Amino acid sequence: LDHTEFLGSTLSEIAYEKAGIIKPGVPVVVGEDLPETRQVFLDKAKENNSQIIFAEDKPEVVNSTMTENYTRLYETVGYGTFEGQLAGECQIKNTNTILHVVPLLLKQGLLPQSYNDKKRITALVREAFSEVSSLTGLMGRWQYAGHRPDIVLDTGHNTGGWAYLGKALQSGNYPQVHVIFGIMADKDIDGVLSFLPQKLHYYFTRDSVARALPPEALRDRAE
């Protein structure tokens, strides 16, 4: 849960606010299907006469692994096998969602007509995923900033993100893992801290903005 002061304190309340982006007659793709939220999205889509697709109902991504080059390899139904520049495990769900969006963009005429060629759109999708950071400027998504030792940057700031990050921090075969960690004071601090693995080395810090939790307070909460 995140931004609860604006969106609500339960998944169904947050889903209701998020569903406000559904526009009349415009298709919508929902990337994550949860029992608490599915009916909320279905009701809003019906109200707006909008086609709704739950990406997890018919997965496009059938397998995904980390490569030796610190990228993520995807095996998909409609786009073959390709590499994604963003290596984090959470990208599997994001990629599956995006691959459901592409056909809808074509159908809605929101991509150039020449992209309707299957070979061309497949090539473009593969290129986009392999160069996503340089094409978009997206940073801090399990981003390798150095090797020997591996240095990884991630902007995970809520329990959803740390459910993935906590596992990822324990998945490598490293004799030691050092974590430099800071968080905003208005986040679910205890919830996030519950996902931090034990027996790692932690260095608590803060951002320069006023919302940041002081490192001393963060250390005390972590203890």
Feature names for model-found ranges:
Residues 1-2, 57-59, 181-184, 205-211:
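Short, acidic/turn-prone active-site loops that include or flank metal/cofactor-
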Residues 1-75, 95, 99-121:
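Acidic, Mg2+-coordinating active-site environments of NTP-dependent enzymes
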Residues 1-3, 13, 78-201:
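Nucleotide phosphate-binding/pyrophosphate-handling subdomain across enzymes
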Residues 8, 89-92, 212:
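Short, solvent-exposed loop/helix junctions and linker helices
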Residues 26-28, 51-52, 176-179, 200-203:
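Hydrophobic beta-strand segments of well-ordered beta-sheets in folded domains
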Residues 32-36, 57, 157, 184, ...:
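Short beta->alpha linker loops
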Residues 34-53, 150-153, 190-223:
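C-terminal helical cap/extension that packs against the catalytic core
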